[in-house]
Structure formats: structure tokens, C-alpha cells
């Protein structure tokens, strides 16, 4: 199995709290992005001290209460399945703070991390504040929920977005990359993809490759898998009969999403 592909685990760290994914700089090639998925049973709680790290807490499914011990956001979260295709609530918590998540119902929570030195205010990102976009045409159509875009100054480094891609379509396509710290032409952003499929026995194909092919991995990502993108192009293809959801986390030295298309495939945009 590729070192860029992670399968879900169920590591129970306390009663009712299971770590499904935990991607860190210590166990991956990433320096700027960390990613964790936590499942909670009703009434259970997860706590964390952030130190020099910022975090976006995404209520993937279910309802949760989040506190940083100064502010409390009660019973947030909007859906029982990501395939309800409606935006959800999130909470941004800055470095050198602590937080607690308590499950109001059974819940799945994504924790999106990046190193941070400059403390910013804790912020509730309401579902209705997610910018919704419909991108692409032909077999290259997807729907985007912008949770923390680069136009929102709420974070120091993090960018967080949800993407839905319908049956038979491609996403992150034509292949693009953002692995050069060369603004204004291109920014350096690492990335993770947390995948779900509907129906859940489905899968998507994701290729991660660089111009020199020093990275060239084509993976079958099944439901609840994570794909790690330290560099390179990273398109996703969705087979007929299935719908794809993924949650992206990006971060790098500059909080700007400026990508570069693979010149070999850029002609696709001209149709």
C-alpha cells in the first residue's frame, strides 16, 4: 500500500472516543498540515491543548458542543450524513489555547491543524457562512463548500474546504499542483484528502504525481480513506454509480491558494 494512503483505524483513547485517523509530521511527509478524525458516542468528550498549532474543528456528522473555556458553541453540526450535501458548522481555535468537544449525538469530527505562532480569536464558522460554488463543466463538475478559504482572515495558515463530485466526474482536474513557493505564480501548500463515498462500498481513484515523477502514485481510495499530498498534481476520478465527498486541508508558508495546471492536460479547459 502506498505511504500516501491511510486506512481508517479505531483507536479508543477513552470511553466513547475513537481516533479514526491521525496524520502528523511525525508519521507522514507533511510539515505544515496535520489531520485527525475522531468519532464520539453521545455524551463522550475529547480535549486537546494546541500549543503552537491552530485547529479547525469540523462537525462532519452529528451534533457537538465545542468550548475553548472562554466561549462555548452549543449543539453545532447540521447533518447525519455528509451526503445530505449541505454545509456544516466548524470552529476555529488558535494556537496556545485548549478546547473540549462534547458529543450531543453520535458524531464524527475532523480536526485540521497547522503550525501557528500568532494567536487569533476563536471563531464559530456557521454553515450558512460557507461559500458554496459549482465548478467545472462536462465530466469535470463538482460542488464546493468553502469553510476556511484564503479570503477569510480567520486563520494564520489553514485552508479547509469540502468537495462533492458526482458519478462519472473528475475533480481537482485538470490536474493541478501547488508545490512551489513562487507567488504570484504559484503557492506552496501541502494537502490531505479525507474521502467518503455514497454508497459506502464505493471507491475513487486518485493519482499524486510530480513533473519529474519522483512522486507517481495512483491509489484506490475507499470510503473513509485519507490521501496525503506532500507535493505534485492530485486529480480524483469517480466511477459510475457513486458520489464522492472529500474534505481538504491545506497549509503552507503563505496562506494563499494559487495553483498551476499540468500543461499536458490544460487543453481540457478550452473545450
Swiss-Prot record:
<dbReference type="InterPro" id="IPR023770">
    <property type="entry name" value="IolB_Bacilli"/>
</dbReference>
<comment type="similarity">
    <text>Belongs to the isomerase IolB family.</text>
</comment>
<dbReference type="InterPro" id="IPR024203">
    <property type="entry name" value="Deoxy-glucuronate_isom_IolB"/>
</dbReference>
<dbReference type="InterPro" id="IPR014710">
    <property type="entry name" value="RmlC-like_jellyroll"/>
</dbReference>
<keyword id="KW-0413">Isomerase</keyword>
<protein>
    <recommendedName>
        <fullName>5-deoxy-glucuronate isomerase</fullName>
        <ecNumber>5.3.1.30</ecNumber>
    </recommendedName>
</protein>
<dbReference type="GO" id="GO:0019310">
    <property type="term" value="P:inositol catabolic process"/>
</dbReference>
<dbReference type="InterPro" id="IPR011051">
    <property type="entry name" value="RmlC_Cupin_sf"/>
</dbReference>
<comment type="function">
    <text>Involved in the isomerization of 5-deoxy-glucuronate (5DG) to 5-dehydro-2-deoxy-D-gluconate (DKG or 2-deoxy-5-keto-D-gluconate).</text>
</comment>
<dbReference type="InterPro" id="IPR021120">
    <property type="entry name" value="KduI/IolB_isomerase"/>
</dbReference>
<dbReference type="GO" id="GO:0008880">
    <property type="term" value="F:glucuronate isomerase activity"/>
</dbReference>
<dbReference type="Pfam" id="PF04962">
    <property type="entry name" value="KduI"/>
</dbReference>
<comment type="pathway">
    <text>Polyol metabolism; myo-inositol degradation into acetyl-CoA; acetyl-CoA from myo-inositol: step 4/7.</text>
</comment>
<dbReference type="GO" id="GO:0102482">
    <property type="term" value="F:5-deoxy-D-glucuronate isomerase activity"/>
</dbReference>
